């Protein structure tokens, strides 16, 4: 059974299709692993054992009847970040204000997983409303990194990444607002992809910052991630930001990249995303990865993106501004927590008491920053200026892609930091998103693929690969080539 849960998703899918293992057997093995280990990791907030086994049984029944499976990943179970709505499990977004809340509808992404025959094991832990870089802001307690239980797994989607690293699930879904898929992937030696904005539906993704949020696939290999990407991507009429365009062949790109041939591929190293402030072991791992890409035949050059120096400041004005608008819906009137509704308090008092009790410190901080940035007299000085910087960052990237096909950088400035180290230092926590957030501002796509263990502390390091909008296939070609050349890594457990 241990060998079964440690297998990659592509292998498991092939075994299910060949009837060498049943979907029910695999799903039960994952549920057993969760039960045996999650008291240490706290990757999950909710377990949907009955629902997952029912979905797996449906796949087995279809196979027994000789029916065609609905997707290449049918029967392979998955961990779903608790920011996507599900009718059969609570959706809390890691917040007390939504404790126990059940959505009346499934997110489009959830529906696509169900239609593909993918059993959903449960909902994973996250920073409250996806605001954080360590999963310590969850109202239900932090997730621990399987590589070192005293370290964070990254955030906001640390639960999904930890579930993969702990072999609780072969597949996972995250959401990425400023790096919440890629950064946890880097810290747990897993693969995470932020797709091009608008290619994965946001309908049913509880909004943090609507112009930045994007759901995406997570797995332990590049090919597995590509296969999941293919399942969840595509136009959705229910999402006004969804693009009506053909999705690149990411699976074909991953398979082609596995040959290890990168001749003719132009790779740019971003000047602004290395140097001072980066852990020496992270830089050493990055330089080794760049050397490996060069050895595979890629043409590597340095690229200047001057406005990246202002990306962090712009991001932490734009994101809180959108947060202050989006979270206004939690008013204690329609759904979720309600405090003081005993007939002795006004509606305004009930709303204030509910928000005071229901929102955590980081969420309150960002709401206040956003309200200030959008206030009369400060809008032009802060929010409007930040949007101008956002345009310049996108222009930097567009110009860079005139001379290169993809960009690379470290995925994070350091390896996983100790639990509690940055939780009371917002600026230090925000700086941890330095490498990943520029892509969200531009709407482009990016991947974190493991690049080994840091010689400093033996913890995982991630290589970030970036590509233009709608060029997601480039990520998978380069990522798969690098993964094949890098070879296998030790496991967390």
Curated annotation (Swiss-Prot):
It comes from the Bacteria. Signal peptide: none annotated. The keyword Ligase applies. Gene3D superfamilies: Amidase signature (AS) domain. One of its GO terms (molecular function) is glutaminyl-tRNA synthase (glutamine-hydrolyzing) activity. The keyword Mitochondrion does not apply. Keywords: ATP-binding, Ligase, Nucleotide-binding, Protein biosynthesis. It is an enzyme of class 6 (ligase). GO terms for biological process: translation. Its EC number is 6.3.5.7. The active site is at residues 81, 156, 180. InterPro entries: Amidase, Amidase_CS, Amidase_dom, AS_sf, GatA. GO terms for cellular component: glutamyl-tRNA(Gln) amidotransferase complex. It catalyses: L-glutamyl-tRNA(Gln) + L-glutamine + ATP + H2O = L-glutaminyl-tRNA(Gln) + L-glutamate + ADP + phosphate + H(+). NCBIfam families: gatA. Allows the formation of correctly charged Gln-tRNA(Gln) through the transamidation of misacylated Glu-tRNA(Gln) in organisms which lack glutaminyl-tRNA synthetase. The reaction takes place in the presence of glutamine and ATP through an activated gamma-phospho-Glu-tRNA(Gln). Belongs to the amidase family. GatA subfamily. This is Glutamyl-tRNA(Gln) amidotransferase subunit A.
């Amino acid at each position: 059974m241990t060998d079964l849960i440690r297998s990659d998703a592509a292998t498991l899918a092939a075994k299910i299709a060949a009837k060498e293992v049943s979907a029910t057997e695999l799903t039960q093995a994952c549920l057993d692993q969760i039960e045996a280990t999650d008291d240490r990791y706290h990757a999950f907030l909710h377990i949907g054992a009955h629902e997952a086994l029912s979905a797996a049984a449906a796949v087995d029944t279809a196979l027994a009847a000789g029916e065609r499976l609905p997707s290449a990943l049918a029967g392979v179970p998955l961990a779903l970040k608790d920011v996507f709505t599900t009718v059969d499990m609570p959706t809390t977004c890691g917040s007390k204000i939504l404790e126990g809340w059940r959505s009346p509808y499934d997110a489009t992404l959830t529906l696509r997983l169900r239609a593909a025959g993918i059993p959903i094991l449960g909902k994973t832990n996250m920073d409250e409303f996806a605001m954080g870089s360590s999963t310590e802001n969850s109202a239900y307690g932090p997730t621990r990194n399987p590589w070192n239980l005293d370290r964070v797994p990254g955030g906001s989607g640390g639960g999904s990444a930890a579930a993969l690293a702990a072999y609780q699930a072969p597949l996972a879904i995250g959401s990425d607002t400023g790096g919440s898929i890629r950064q946890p992937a880097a810290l747990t030696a897993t693969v995470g992809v932020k797709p091009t904005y608008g290619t994965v539906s946001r309908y049913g993704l509880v909004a943090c910052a609507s112009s930045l949020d994007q759901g995406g696939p997570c797995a332990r290999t590049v090919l597995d991630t590509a296969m999941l990407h293919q399942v969840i991507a595509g136009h959705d009429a229910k999402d006004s930001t969804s693009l009506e365009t053909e999705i690149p062949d990411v699976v074909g790109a991953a398979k082609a990249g596995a040959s290890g041939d990168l001749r003719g591929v132009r790779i740019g190293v971003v000047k602004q995303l290395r140097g001072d402030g980066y852990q020496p072991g992270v830089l050493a791992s990055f330089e080794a990865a760049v050397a490996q890409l060069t050895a595979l035949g890629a043409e590597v050059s340095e690229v200047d993106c001057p406005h990246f120096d202002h990306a962090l400041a712009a991001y932490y004005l734009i994101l809180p501004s959108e947060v202050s608008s989006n979270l206004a819906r939690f008013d204690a009137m329609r759904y979720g927590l309600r405090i003081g509704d005993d007939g002795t308090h006004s509606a305004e008092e009930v709303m204030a008491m509910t928000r005071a009790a229901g929102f955590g410190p980081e969420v309150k901080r960002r709401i206040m920053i956003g309200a200030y940035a959008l206030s009369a007299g400060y809008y032009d000085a802060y929010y409007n200026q930040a949007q101008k910087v956002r345009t310049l960052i996108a222009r930097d990237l567009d110009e860079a892609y005139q001379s290169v096909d993809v960009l690379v950088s470290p995925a994070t400035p350091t390896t996983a930091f100790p639990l509690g180290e940055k939780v009371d230092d917002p600026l230090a926590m925000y700086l941890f998103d330095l490498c990943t957030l520029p892509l969200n501002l531009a709407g482009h796509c990016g991947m974190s693929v493991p690049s080994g263990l840091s010689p400093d502390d033996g913890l995982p390091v991630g290589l970030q690969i970036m590509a233009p909008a709608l060029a997601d296939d480039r990520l998978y070609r380069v990522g798969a080539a690098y993964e094949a050349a890098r070879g296998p890594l030790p496991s967390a457990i």
